[in-house]
Amino acid sequence: MIRDERWEGVYSFEDSPFIMEILTELRDENTGPIAFRKGLVKLGRYMAYEITKTMETERIKIKTPLEETDGILIADRRNVVIITVLRAAIPLMEGLIKVLDHARVGIVSASRGKAPKFEIEMKYVKVPQITEKDTVIIADPMIATGSTLIKVLDEVKKYGKAKRYVIVGVLAAPEGISRIKEAHPDVEMFVAAIDRELNEKGYILPGLGDAGDRAFGAPIKV
């Protein structure tokens, strides 16, 4: 895990050969939807494991069949809310919840409009009550302009004040990270990699394309 010195609380996993191998497959234009979804699940699971290293633990006493001994409990793992940003984050959330299996789950449908305005439309919000003990994890694979996540954070914070707000993504652009940190300085961010820049259409370069379309197929207009 690498802390990026350009921002407070922003981390990437570019030092992990395993995560970089998964990311390489996700970037490859020849990777089909099934393998793409499986890759997102694997990333979510491994990144959740890494995030547990930042959670508070407590020592507990247990009894084995032979004697009493000390053990460890990851206390924060019992108080997690995962917010899934539809639709691309569904496989990522599936991986996260394999490790954070006590998590309550919220669903947000938010989509970004076209350049140059990139207006955000939020159609559906179902979020559980949030308490001061909770770590709120917002799953969204692509952190591009940051507009969607700013809007989601604005909405999620209406449901209660959390102990931590964490964004988990696959790729992020520096422009999006800066915008999110300016709007919500308290948020932490964990991504597989931080890419170079955005193009004129708001896509991350070198990126991996539209994560939702690659995972589930391109939608059609009727």
From Swiss-Prot:
<dbReference type="InterPro" id="IPR050054">
    <property type="entry name" value="UPRTase/APRTase"/>
</dbReference>
<dbReference type="GO" id="GO:0000287">
    <property type="term" value="F:magnesium ion binding"/>
</dbReference>
<feature type="binding site">
    <location>
        <position position="112"/>
    </location>
    <ligand>
        <name>5-phospho-alpha-D-ribose 1-diphosphate</name>
    </ligand>
</feature>
<dbReference type="GO" id="GO:0004845">
    <property type="term" value="F:uracil phosphoribosyltransferase activity"/>
</dbReference>
<feature type="binding site">
    <location>
        <position position="87"/>
    </location>
    <ligand>
        <name>5-phospho-alpha-D-ribose 1-diphosphate</name>
    </ligand>
</feature>
<comment type="function">
    <text>Catalyzes the conversion of uracil and 5-phospho-alpha-D-ribose 1-diphosphate (PRPP) to UMP and diphosphate.</text>
</comment>
<keyword id="KW-0460">Magnesium</keyword>
<dbReference type="GO" id="GO:0005525">
    <property type="term" value="F:GTP binding"/>
</dbReference>
<comment type="pathway">
    <text>Pyrimidine metabolism; UMP biosynthesis via salvage pathway; UMP from uracil: step 1/1.</text>
</comment>
<dbReference type="GO" id="GO:0006223">
    <property type="term" value="P:uracil salvage"/>
</dbReference>
<keyword id="KW-0808">Transferase</keyword>
<keyword id="KW-0021">Allosteric enzyme</keyword>
<protein>
    <recommendedName>
        <fullName>Uracil phosphoribosyltransferase</fullName>
        <ecNumber>2.4.2.9</ecNumber>
    </recommendedName>
</protein>
<keyword id="KW-0328">Glycosyltransferase</keyword>
<keyword id="KW-0342">GTP-binding</keyword>
<dbReference type="InterPro" id="IPR029057">
    <property type="entry name" value="PRTase-like"/>
</dbReference>
<feature type="binding site">
    <location>
        <position position="204"/>
    </location>
    <ligand>
        <name>uracil</name>
    </ligand>
</feature>
<dbReference type="GO" id="GO:0044206">
    <property type="term" value="P:UMP salvage"/>
</dbReference>
<feature type="binding site">
    <location>
        <begin position="140"/>
        <end position="148"/>
    </location>
    <ligand>
        <name>5-phospho-alpha-D-ribose 1-diphosphate</name>
    </ligand>
</feature>
<dbReference type="InterPro" id="IPR034331">
    <property type="entry name" value="Upp_A"/>
</dbReference>
<dbReference type="InterPro" id="IPR005765">
    <property type="entry name" value="Ura_phspho_trans"/>
</dbReference>
<comment type="similarity">
    <text>Belongs to the UPRTase family.</text>
</comment>
<dbReference type="InterPro" id="IPR000836">
    <property type="entry name" value="PRibTrfase_dom"/>
</dbReference>
<dbReference type="Pfam" id="PF14681">
    <property type="entry name" value="UPRTase"/>
</dbReference>
<feature type="binding site">
    <location>
        <position position="210"/>
    </location>
    <ligand>
        <name>5-phospho-alpha-D-ribose 1-diphosphate</name>
    </ligand>
</feature>
<feature type="binding site">
    <location>
        <begin position="209"/>
        <end position="211"/>
    </location>
    <ligand>
        <name>uracil</name>
    </ligand>
</feature>
<feature type="binding site">
    <location>
        <begin position="38"/>
        <end position="42"/>
    </location>
    <ligand>
        <name>GTP</name>
    </ligand>
</feature>
<keyword id="KW-0547">Nucleotide-binding</keyword>
